[in-house]
Amino acid sequence: MSDDWVEIYTDGACKGNPGPGGWGALLIYKGVKRELWGGEPDTTNNRMELMAAIRALAELKRPCKVRLVTDSQYVMQGINDWMPNWKKRGWKTASKQPVKNADLWQQLDEQVNRHEVSWQWVRGHTGHPGNEQADLLANRGVVQAKRQPIV
């Protein structure tokens, strides 16, 4: 990977679905690592996967070339297959239903448009160092979320 690229590894976690959830992201640029995490007391795993990518991309101060690595098929399919049609249909599915998590998909779309993003899927929990670190961070977010009041 060229030094011009920012590498981002993201993951989401949820204890119960819905339940307390966390997101984590590892950003690497020119050998410097930055860890981000957070959580919500009542959420879903898919929302946390999306939040990880959104928050990581939003952290970048200027437009960048990004390689974003995720273990989420939901995020990969959404970004590559579903989103173009959702946008054409006014954020509706093929069956004319509102897109689930449209608020986050729209935020992700906004962030992706700021950067040049190359998406890569990796299988989770297979020892990939960046993905494993993102998983640890997401679980840190779950612990944080469990301490937050729901109201």
UniProtKB/Swiss-Prot annotation:
Residue ranges of the RNase H type-1 domain?
2-143
Q: Which UniProt keyword terms apply here?
A: Cytoplasm, Endonuclease, Hydrolase, Magnesium, Metal-binding, Nuclease
Which terms in the GO cellular component ontology are assigned?
A: cytoplasm
Record-annotated residues binding Mg(2+) 2? D11, D135
Which terms in the Gene Ontology molecular function aspect does this entry carry?
magnesium ion binding; nucleic acid binding; RNA-DNA hybrid ribonuclease activity
Name the major location: cytoplasm
Question: Would the keyword Metal-binding be found if you checked this record's keyword annotation?
Answer: yes
EC code: 3.1.26.4
Disulphide linkage map:
none
Enzyme class, top EC level, equals: hydrolase
**Entry's cofactor comment:** Binds 1 Mg(2+) ion per subunit. May bind a second metal ion at a regulatory site, or after substrate binding.
What family is it from?
Answer: Belongs to the RNase H family.
Quote the protein name from its UniProt record: Ribonuclease H
Identify the species of origin: Stutzerimonas stutzeri (strain A1501)
